[in-house]
């Protein structure tokens, strides 16, 4: 369709996705992406050595980690008159917000499941019998990450809404916390980890992540406007692809819990 302004629709879709997804903030961005694959650079550094009068140089290089996109979802919707819609930015925004809210839920579920499966530290199931137990479980997870020498900065912990509810009953945590649109619990950290709440986190799981330990990327591969053959309307369809990978298993920790 000649009058379809792809850049306009794509920009609104991407902006609305970024407003509701935290993955881009808490993961390593890809070095490059093609239509079919995604590439991350993993840094390989030299060892620290004893000085005995001579210098032995080590190579510092990046090791590419390449994977095919294994998340692929599309939307295909009637929008009436595309040309008229393109003169109404509020209409396009409403469309983009609705589509990306659904897409972000699917992408988040996919990525968190991959991170949890690839966690290098898996703590035994925790029995939560009192509000304080949830806070303590998160502290313990952070301790395990510390034992693996995971950097203190850029640590996140992903929890479900039931876990956040337990935290709110704990005197050590803020009551009625401010949850941002992307799931970050504003201004709240436990054991140095920024709290992220998501309905798409693995069930009954506390997931600790260091930004440098996981990679994630997503893009809209196809976005088209067309006149529908079986309806008196125009249509817009798009294909979203994504890839998520654990780059350093030591930087990811997970524990399951049972609320009793």
Segments the model singles out, each with a brief description of its role:
Residues 82-148, 255-260:
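Alpha-helical scaffold segments that mediate packing/assembly in large oligomeric complexes
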Residues 79-81, 161:
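Residues immediately flanking
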Residues 53-55:
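Glycine-rich loop at the start of a catalytic domain that most often binds anionic cofactors/ligands
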Residues 1-2, 117:
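Intrinsic low-complexity, intrinsically disordered segments enriched in polar/basic residues
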Residues 2-25, 29-49, 58-79, 86, ...:
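Sequence/fold signature of self-assembling virion shell proteins
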Residues 17, 51, 74, 110-112, ...:
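Sequence-level detector for tyrosine residue identity
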Residues 119-188:
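Extended, solvent-exposed, turn-rich assembly/linker loops in the middle of proteins
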């Amino acid at each position: 369709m000649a009058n379809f302004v792809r850049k306009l629709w794509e920009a609104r879709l991407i902006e609305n996705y970024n407003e509701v997804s935290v993955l881009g903030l808490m993961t390593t961005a890809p070095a490059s992406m093609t239509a079919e694959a995604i590439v991350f650079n993993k840094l390989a550094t030299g060892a620290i050595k004893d000085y005995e009068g001579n210098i032995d140089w080590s190579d510092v290089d990046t090791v590419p980690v390449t994977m095919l996109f294994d998340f692929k979802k599309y939307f295909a919707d009637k929008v009436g008159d595309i040309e008229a819609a393109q003169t109404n930015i509020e209409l396009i925004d409403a469309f983009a917000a609705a589509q990306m809210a659904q897409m972000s839920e699917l992408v988040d579920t996919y990525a968190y499941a991959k991170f949890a499966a690839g966690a290098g530290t898996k703590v035994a199931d925790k029995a939560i019998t009192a509000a304080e137990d949830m806070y303590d479980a998160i502290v313990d997870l952070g301790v395990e990450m510390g034992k693996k020498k995971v950097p203190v900065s850029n640590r996140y912990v992903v929890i479900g809404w039931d876990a956040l509810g337990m935290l709110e009953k704990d005197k050590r945590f803020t009551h009625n916390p401010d949850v941002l649109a992307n799931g970050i619990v504003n201004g709240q950290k436990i054991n140095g980890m920024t709290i992220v709440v998501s309905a798409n986190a693995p069930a009954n799981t506390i997931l600790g992540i260091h930004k440098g330990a996981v990679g994630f990327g997503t893009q809209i591969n196809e976005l088209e406007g067309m006149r529908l053959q079986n309806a008196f309307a125009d249509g817009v369809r798009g294909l979203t692809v994504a890839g998520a990978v654990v780059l350093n298993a030591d930087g990811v920790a997970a524990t399951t819990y049972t609320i009793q």
